[in-house]
């Protein structure tokens, strides 16, 4: 079946494009882009169009990269659940038994997921055309940027659809897609900025390289996904995939998780073969030993291997070569936790609703505090242990005699570790809070990611935007206080005194240390930002924990919550 008479495509388009969410999201997307253009519009009274104004190029780069990042982050939310949604709705077996060819199924899912994103990107074209009369950017650069953008979105969409073939849950497919897509997004941004001064070469490379890479990645993934649907794995009752953890460990490639050995048992303890001890929390024990890893360990193994692969070069560059840039390695650790943490918390309550066991859980003799802490600590334990694996290079650098800078900044390292720990707690709390409100795990996970992006990424983006386009304005203090909510800003603001290749960053000059207004040699003005972050994060977690405890005490509120 072709594109025009593909029933999968027709059904998906009707479901996706005729909902209120589609129109609301399109309106918000356009309003956000228009707001960026409006506030970043040059304030000069006179513009010399014969020159190449840098302000215009900055504006267009901001628009393109913002558009690219937002669209790239939205792609897995539309495509990662294309196949896993059928599995969760228990229609996957019916779809495989239909006369549709697997290629038609994959093609219909891919085109349907990408159609709405194509509409979002295409409708942004009139907005960017407003910048062309300002000069500095040619029409061919705009054309090349949109060609590269569409090629990237098609590639990311195919990665997300293919990920849904190998996972049963949308949450696992979503996280696996992000693990693969985010490094590609960063590489694309680096490519765009590295050729900023060579506009013609960037246009030629974009028009030639991006389509070739898109075909090289998308075509093999399309064939692999079609073959997997043609020869699916064993299906159990209700069309559920039968997963044997021992067989999966034998056939796995690369990392193998041994649940009975250290350190794997820290985040994946083996299944219980004896009775629980008296006073043990049955919710916590069930979540840790059966629930979290009940659908296999493929997503977990992929997350560990990708994170370790990226950590090796980042560790060498930021922790040993350019030690003044070591906060960027902490940013990588924080980003990993923001990506992996909600997976183990955002489905804690929604999974009970999907199995229709939540009412049974709420009518047991377990207290609300036991249910709440069991759900929270299980997800927090897994995410924090996985995140701690990435902190071993920092601990190693602290103990290495040939790198004395970190021992000289011992309190700074402790503050970094504290920021990572608070971030782990916040991601688990936000995920569990969203899971208490929504009915589907996929919805809860997407909302959790959206909340964390608004909480941790939007404030530093607003601060950077204000510094660039409103350097002397009353908005500066507001942007400073908002940025205090983000741990990414906090790890950079904490003072770090290192002798990096013979030079010390001016903002962290040694002359500031030891002043009269200081704590252990660090000026109070450098500690102020981290203190605000510490206080704000503690208040947020206390408020979320208190709210969820109240909800679990009022059992009917959790039981009857809907989308």
Label each PLM-derived region with a short phrase.
Residues 10, 96, 106-107, 285, ...:
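Short, surface-exposed helix/turn micro-motifs that flank interaction/cofactor sites
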Residues 93, 106, 174-175, 359, ...:
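Hydrophobic/aromatic positions within or immediately flanking transmembrane alpha-helices
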Residues 1-72, 81, 120, 126-347, ...:
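Transmembrane alpha-helical segments and their membrane-interface loop/helix boundaries
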Residues 75-96, 109-110, 325-329, 342-362, ...:
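Transmembrane helix boundary and interhelical loop/hinge segments in multi-pass membrane proteins
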Residues 15, 25, 91-93, 113, ...:
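General helical structural elements
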Residues 104-117, 161, 165, 370-383, ...:
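Start (N-cap) of specific transmembrane helices in multi-pass transporter permeases
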Residues 15, 87, 102-103, 109-110, ...:
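Internal catalytic domains of large membrane-associated glycosyltransferases
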């Amino acid at each position: 079946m072709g594109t025009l008479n593909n029933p999968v495509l027709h059904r998906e388009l009707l479901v996706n494009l005729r909902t209120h969410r589609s129109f609301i999201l399109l309106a918000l997307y356009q309003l956000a882009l228009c707001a960026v253009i409006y506030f970043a519009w040059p304030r000069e009274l006179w513009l010399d169009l014969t020159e190449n104004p840098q302000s215009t190029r900055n504006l267009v780069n901001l628009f393109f990269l913002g558009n690219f990042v937002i669209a790239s982050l939205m792609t897995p939310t539309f495509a990662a659940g294309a196949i896993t949604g059928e599995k969760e709705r228990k229609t996957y077996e019916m779809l495989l038994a239909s006369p549709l060819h697997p290629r038609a199924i994959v093609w219909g899912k891919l085109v349907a997921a990408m159609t709405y994103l194509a509409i979002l990107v295409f409708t942004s074209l009139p907005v960017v055309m407003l910048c062309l009369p300002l000069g500095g950017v040619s029409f061919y650069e705009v054309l090349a940027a949109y060609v590269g953008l569409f090629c990237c979105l098609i590639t990311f969409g195919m990665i997300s659809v293919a990920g849904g073939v190998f996972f049963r849950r949308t949450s696992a497919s979503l996280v696996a897609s992000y693990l693969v897509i985010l490094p590609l997004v960063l590489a694309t941004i680096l490519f765009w900025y590295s050729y900023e001064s060579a506009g013609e070469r960037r246009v030629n490379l974009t028009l030639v390289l991006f389509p070739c890479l898109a075909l090289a990645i998308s075509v093999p993934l399309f064939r692999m996904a079609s073959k997997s649907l043609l020869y699916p794995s064993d299906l159990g009752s209700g069309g559920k995939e039968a997963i044997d953890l021992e067989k999966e460990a034998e056939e796995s490639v690369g990392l193998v998780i041994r649940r009975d050995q250290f350190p794997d048992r820290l985040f994946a303890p083996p299944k219980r073969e004896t009775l629980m001890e008296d006073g043990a929390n049955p919710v916590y024990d069930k979540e840790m030993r059966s629930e979290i890893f009940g659908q296999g360990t493929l997503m977990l193994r992929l997350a560990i291997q990708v994170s370790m692969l990226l950590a090796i070069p980042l560790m060498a560059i930021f922790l040993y070569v350019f030690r003044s840039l070591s906060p960027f390695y902490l940013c990588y650790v924080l980003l990993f936790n923001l990506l992996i943490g909600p997976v183990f918390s955002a489905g804690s309550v929604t999974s009970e609703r999907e199995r229709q066991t939540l009412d049974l859980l709420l009518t047991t003799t377990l207290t609300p505090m036991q249910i709440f802490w069991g759900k929270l600590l299980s997800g927090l334990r897994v995410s924090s242990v996985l995140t701690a694996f990435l902190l071993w290079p920092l601990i190693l650098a602290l103990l290495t005699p040939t790198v004395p800078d970190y021992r000289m900044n011992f309190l700074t390292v402790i503050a970094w570790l504290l920021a990572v720990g608070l971030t782990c707690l916040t991601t688990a709390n936000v995920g569990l809070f969203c899971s208490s409100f929504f009915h589907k795990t996929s919805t809860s996970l997407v909302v959790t990611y959206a909340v964390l992006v608004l909480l941790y990424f939007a404030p530093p983006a607003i601060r950077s935007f204000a510094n660039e386009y409103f350097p002397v304005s009353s908005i500066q203090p507001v942007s400073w206080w908002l940025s205090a909510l983000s741990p990414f800003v906090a790890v950079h603001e904490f003072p770090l005194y290192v002798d990096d290749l013979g030079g010390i960053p001016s903002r962290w000059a040694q002359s500031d240390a030891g002043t009269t207004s200081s704590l252990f040699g660090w000026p109070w003005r450098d500690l102020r930002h981290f203190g605000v972050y510490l206080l704000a994060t503690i208040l947020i977690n206390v408020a979320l924990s208190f709210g969820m405890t109240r909800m679990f005490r009022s059992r009917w509120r959790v039981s009857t919550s809907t989308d």
